[in-house]
């Protein structure tokens, strides 16, 4: 009986741990992509399952994530992540803003500064592309 009770408690604790630690940190987005480290050192992207978005459980080494979200929702995300602007750059039809959040563990060095959150404005339909640590590929 003690073994069964112990196993039940262990399963419950594991489930609670997954629920509180996992999922995406980019809440409120759509069209998610997850970046994983490939065997050769490059990056592989995958569309996450709904279970991943809820719990975040994976056996792969996650290197980052991205999604699209309404530009009007970005401020709420930045506030929730306690992100501070590091620098920004603009072009003819885009604005890139780079942030650092103490709540995101991984970061990259850009222009000698730590960056772990990248917001690219300029998409159609009032959408922004948000990524950790930066947007990979084209936008």
Regions found by a protein language model. Name each.
Residues 9-17:
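Hydrophobic h-region of N-terminal signal peptides that target proteins for export
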Residues 110-139:
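A cross-kingdom marker for long, charged
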Residues 52-110:
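Mature extracytoplasmic domains of secretory-pathway proteins
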Residues 16-66:
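N-terminal export/targeting and maturation segments
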Residues 40-45, 76, 105-109, 136-139:
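Short, surface-exposed beta-strand/loop "edge" segments at domain boundaries and coil↔beta transitions
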Residues 1-4:
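Positively charged n-region of N-terminal signal peptides that target proteins for export
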Residues 27, 35-37, 100, 122, ...:
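A structural detector for beta-sheet-dominated domains
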Residues 44-45, 96-100, 130:
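Generic recognition of long tandem-repeat/solenoid scaffolds
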């Amino acid at each position: 009986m003690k073994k069964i009770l112990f196993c039940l408690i262990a399963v419950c604790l594991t489930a609670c741990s997954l629920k509180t630690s996992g999922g995406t940190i980019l809440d409120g987005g759509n069209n998610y992509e997850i970046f994983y480290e490939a065997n050769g050192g490059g990056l592989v992207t995958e569309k996450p399952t709904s279970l991943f978005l809820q719990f975040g459980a994976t056996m792969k080494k996650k290197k980052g994530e991205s999604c699209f979200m309404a530009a009007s929702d970005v401020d709420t995300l930045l506030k929730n992540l306690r992100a501070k602007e590091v620098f920004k750059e603009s072009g003819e039809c885009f604005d890139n803003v780079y942030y650092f959040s103490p709540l995101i563990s991984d970061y990259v060095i850009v222009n000698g500064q730590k960056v772990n959150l990248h917001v690219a404005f300029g998409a159609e339909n009032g959408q922004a592309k948000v990524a950790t640590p930066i947007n990979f590929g084209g936008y």
